Structures are given as structure tokens and as C-alpha cells.
Amino acid sequence: MLNILGRRNSSNVQKVLWVCDELHLSYEREDIGGTFGHNQSSKYLAMNPNGLVPTLIDNGRTLWESNAIVRYLCESREPHGLLPQDPWSIALAQQWMDWQQTTLGPAIRPLFRNLVRTAQQNRDLEVIAAGRNKTEAALRILDDHLSQHRYVTGNHFSFGDIPVGVMAYRWFNLDIQRAALPSLEDWYHRLTTHQAYRDNVMMTLS
């Protein structure tokens, strides 16, 4: 039995829950972080010294960093499911996972925090505008790629779609004006046909 430590409204936890349900893995989850706290306790820091979520416990072993957890689960539990079948496609999936962490995530994070987790009277409009512009610029890169591919690695859904798919839900559900990105929108709607996406990602932003 897998144990996942982390609150459901964390985008990084959502990645792990989504992949678990896609692979039909049994797990237990404990609310950690955010308003639930406990992520700075000595017990938790012994497992994840960053004090962040999620943390995965598998047979007494611990693993942190959400994208590493996603890769581990796909490689160890279901080698012919969400894991592409050739080294090039695996590398492409990893490329887009890394891009989510280094480019898309940092762009959308200030926008999300100001619009969702900050009282209206305390919101920084300049940060919101800059975040919207940076996120849109990043998503244009993905939109251009998806104009030639149904999913990030080609014609088949893979673990590479999961991190960017979580970010896409936030983008399409924030109260902002969005430029038309038709290939991105088509890909997003394909993701919404996945029950695991609806169950673990498509929730009220908080």
C-alpha cells in the first residue's frame, strides 16, 4: 500500500493522485501542508527535509519531488501504461515535466496565489498582470507544440502530460482574460475526458 502525504489542493499532490488513479493503484493519503500544517514537524522533516508536499512512502522508503514520484510510479508499477515505449518519447515526456517545473510553474504561481489565496483588497495588480503575461507566453510554447501533436509526446497520453495538465486546469479556471490558444484548449478538453483528471484535478481552486 502506498502512502501519500499532502493536501489535495496542492498542484504537486494532484499530479501524484492523478497518476495513481490512472494506474489503478491503491493508496492512503494524509492531509499535510497548507492549513493542515505538520510539514515542519520533526517527523515530517525526517522524511522530507524540504518541508514540502508531497512525500511518497512505499514499503518504508520515502521519496519526494512530485515529478520524480510520477516517474517512479510509472516506471515501477505500469511499464506499458503511461510510460512511452521508446527512449526518445520518454525523454520528450521528461522534457515537458522539467519545463513545467522550471518555466510554467514559476510563471503561474504568483498569479494563482494572488487571485486564489490572497484577499481581494490585498492583491497586487502588477504581479497579477505580469503573471498572466508570463504564463500566457509559456503556454504559447506548449500550444505551438500541441498544434502538431495530440499529447506532449505524440499521439498517446503519457506521464509527460500530467504536470502540465495540472497547470492547464488552473490557467483555464482562473478569473482572468485569456488569449485564444486553440491547440492547448483541444488538448485540455481531451484531458477532461479522463476520470482520474476530473477526480483529482478538476476541483474548486483553493
Residue ranges and their predicted role:
Residues 24-26, 140, 182, 206:
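Compositionally biased amphipathic helical and low-complexity segments enriched in hydrophobic
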Residues 199-206:
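Short, flexible loop/turn segments with low-complexity composition
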Residues 88, 100-193, 200:
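GST-like fold's C-terminal all-alpha helical module
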Residues 50, 76, 148-149, 194:
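Structured helix-beta-strand junction loops
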Residues 34-35, 160, 205:
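Conserved beta-strand edge residues that scaffold enzyme active sites
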Residues 1-9, 14-129, 143:
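GST-like domain detector, emphasizing the conserved glutathione-binding G-site
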Residues 25, 42, 70, 149, ...:
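Intrinsically disordered, low-complexity segments enriched in small/polar residues
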